[in-house]
Amino acid sequence: DEGLVGSEMCIRDRVGVILDGLYAGTADCVGIYNEKESLIDFKTAKKIKPKEWIEDYFLQCSAYANAHNVMFGTDIKQIVILMADRNQEFKKFVVNGREFDHYTNKWKQKLINFHNTKL
């Protein structure tokens, strides 16, 4: 597997996002991956993690993608996590379609729950 090669490109890197004062963060990269507008995040680890262990990465990226969509009028519906470990192993995780919607809805529910506990 390889990272950003071929027609993939990073359009903007280190993109600050904020949504209605609810949350803010910095996305590593907004670009094109497999011909789709994507939020791309780079992760390093001691060892490549299985997908089941990185749900928080997908939640964070869905939050950033949705904030970017609101701020800049984009329509990002794909998350790409590019992970490399100490042994130079590489793994990519791509989330789109129903899976992207699942993480977006889960993030929104966490946000609602957080703000309800503050009231």
Regions found by a protein language model. Name each.
Residues 15-117:
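Mg2+/Mn2+-dependent nuclease catalytic core
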Residues 1-11:
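Single conserved hydrophobic/aromatic residue that forms the stacking wall/gate
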